[in-house]
Amino acid sequence: MFHHADKGGKKSAFGHPVCGQIILSIILLRPPLLVTAFPVNTVEEQICKDPGFPEHGIRTPSIGKFFENSVARFSCADGFSLKGPAKIICTRFYNGSLGWKPSLKPVCLSEDCLPPFIEDADVTNRTYRPGDSLIISCHEGFQIRYPDTETMESVCQADGTWDNQPTCQGCLRPLIPPHSYMNISETKFSVPVGTVVHYQCFPGYKLEGPELLECMYNLIWSDTPPRCLDVEACSLPPMIEHGDYTCHPHPCDRYIHGTVVEYYCYPGYSLANDYKYITCQYGQWFPQMQLYCVKDETTWPGFQDSLLTTWKVVACTATSVLLALLLVITAKMFHYKCKSQQSPSDEPDESRDPNILVVDGVAVPLPSYEEAISGNYCQPPNDLPPDGLESAQHSEEQNPPSYPGHTGSQNSVPLDTGDVENCDSLSDTSECLQGLQPSSSHPGGLNMSEKTNAITSMEETASTSPSIDIADEIPLVEDGEEDC
């Protein structure tokens, strides 16, 4: 219990009034020192941890302890640049602990600039020192562009970055109008010079504007993109009796622009004309023509079988005609061959007799065709020797033989100077004929009775008839008398 001095100048409990007041004031101002006891910080808690040294860098101070509010400074060796804060301070935080502020630890990096990645370009060098210029080449159809069009150069900075880094550009990907598509992938943001873009509209829309756009050398498009406008759909296509239609594309949900309708007829019917398609164009069917199915006049259930049967009939008919013609030709050829190759021995007995020509009642025997050709008439067949035969043939060639009725003519020449007698007078005619006619054993010769009758008739006629001159123009044998 404290006792204060009264107004009468009494002393306080401490013996002096002024000292008592000072002590009381100290106690009242510092109550925690007397009432509450806080723990005392250790030595480790009174300093900051060593921040270390950056690689290829320097720290100041390099040694010592860092108490509260101590400062550490950093720098890098030549050829490297500092990344991060250049100085840090040892600071006490709200929880009473000490730490570095800012907390980011600095590092020293190489000052060489790494090659940048530039789309649609190739970088020539792999490393660049500060102050070096970037060297690139753009792909074909792309052109180099710099952010700063006045500098037109990219330089490696001291901190390893590039200044005024360029890009390789083509024409920027054009816009795609609604309800349309084009032949450029959505992943491409630029296209090289010379690229042609083809625009097309979805079904039910028509294109308004240029269909093709080209990327020009100045990296702009040749024209503005087109638009796709909605068009009116066509109404139901006209129906046909005994037939139906189908749509392309199938199914026919809506007859939009470009829809094609194909007509067909039921079995037993066919279209009246060959055209069977109509197309929806801008809300109208084209061509505007009436299609209808007509009944087939003749149905062919098995067209292939009937076609084969028809060919069989035609082939059989042609074969029959050819065979008939071949038979006729063969028969005709055989007929001519038989006529040309028939021998005298094959003739009947009536034709074996020599032909006799009656002139003014005189029967004149004529030589056969073979005898006239060979020139052996009035020559005994087996009596002449070879020499006489040659002279007789020579005489025959110079002077033709005399016919009965010629008397003492200057053209009459002896047939032979040998044993053969001349036939100069009608009195010797019988003897001449008897010697000239072949024997009865020779084919085609006359029998004795026929010879006698012929000779008697000639002798009787020769005495009363004048000399007979037979013209040389009379044919010996008619060509048409020999038949097969």
Swiss-Prot record:
Gene Ontology cellular component terms for the protein in this record: membrane
Subcellular location: Membrane
Protein name: Sushi domain-containing protein 4
Keyword DNA-binding (UniProt): no
Main subcellular location of this protein, as a coarse class: membrane
Annotated region (Disordered), positions in chain: 374-484
Keywords linked to the UniProt accession: Disulfide bond, Glycoprotein, Membrane, Repeat, Signal, Sushi, Transmembrane, Transmembrane helix
Biased composition (Acidic residues): 470-484
SUPFAM superfamilies found in the cross-reference section: Complement control module/SCR domain
Signal peptide: 1-35
Biased composition (Polar residues): 424-442, 449-467
Membrane-spanning intervals of the chain: 311-331
Record membrane topology: Single-pass type I membrane protein
Entry superkingdom: Eukaryota
Organism: Danio rerio (Zebrafish)
Gene that produces this protein: susd4
One biological process term in Gene Ontology: regulation of complement activation
CDD domains (alphabetical): CCP (cd00033)
